[in-house]
């Protein structure tokens, strides 16, 4: 997916969120989303800064496992609600997930904050931190280096006990 397509998909998601919030008439949610948009410039990270592998390693839950009052801090929707994925959204091959699961999955980050999988993938296109506490998310390069180091240690241990 090109940067332009990612921005278009992200914009579509935000538009859907704003329409939903306007329909509900909750000004505080709209204000919160507007502040979020003002704080974060939606750009795309270079490919060596992506976090797809780290995302695949994070714990997963389904939307029906979430508490009634749990909210996704990215879209401000209840975590029990499935995400309506735009028809033109292309799921990145690196995520290795089927479209049905993508909309019903909640990711539990290492810091224990939970987000809709779809929302978090869009967030990680532009940021390398948890949207709530700003804990850094490892890049694919860092995950690969850790895996390489772990494999070397296992090989060493198997050879020298």
UniProtKB/Swiss-Prot annotation:
Gene Ontology molecular function: zinc ion binding
Coiled-coil boundaries: none
SMART domains linked to this entry: RING
Top-level taxon of origin: Eukaryota
ZnF endpoints (RING-type): 72-134
Disulfide bonds: none
InterPro entries per the UniProt record, alphabetical: HRD1_E3_ubiq-ligases (IPR050731), Znf_RING (IPR001841), Znf_RING/FYVE/PHD (IPR013083)
PROSITE patterns given in the database record: ZF_RING_2
Keywords in alphabetical order: Metal-binding, Zinc, Zinc-finger
Residue segments, region Disordered: 140-161
PANTHER family given in the database record: RING ZINC FINGER PROTEIN
Protein known as: Uncharacterized RING finger protein ZK637.14
Upper taxonomic lineage: Eukaryota, Metazoa, Ecdysozoa, Nematoda, Chromadorea
């Amino acid at each position: 997916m090109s940067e332009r397509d990612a921005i278009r998909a992200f914009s579509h998601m935000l538009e859907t969120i704003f329409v939903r919030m306007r329909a509900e008439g909750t000004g505080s949610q709209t204000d919160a989303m507007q502040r979020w948009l003002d704080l974060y410039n939606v750009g795309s990270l270079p490919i060596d800064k992506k976090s797809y592998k780290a995302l695949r390693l994070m714990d997963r839950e389904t939307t029906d496992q979430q508490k009634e009052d749990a909210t996704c801090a990215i879209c401000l929707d209840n975590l029990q609600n499935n995400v309506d994925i735009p028809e033109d959204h292309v799921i990145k091959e690196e995520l290795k997930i089927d479209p049905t699961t993508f909309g019903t999955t909640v990711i539990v980050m290492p810091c224990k904050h939970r987000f809709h999988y779809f929302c978090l993938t869009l967030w990680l296109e532009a940021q390398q931190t948890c949207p709530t506490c700003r804990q850094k998310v490892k890049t694919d390069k860092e995950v690969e280096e850790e895996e390489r180091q772990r494999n070397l240690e296992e090989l060493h241990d198997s050879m020298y006990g």
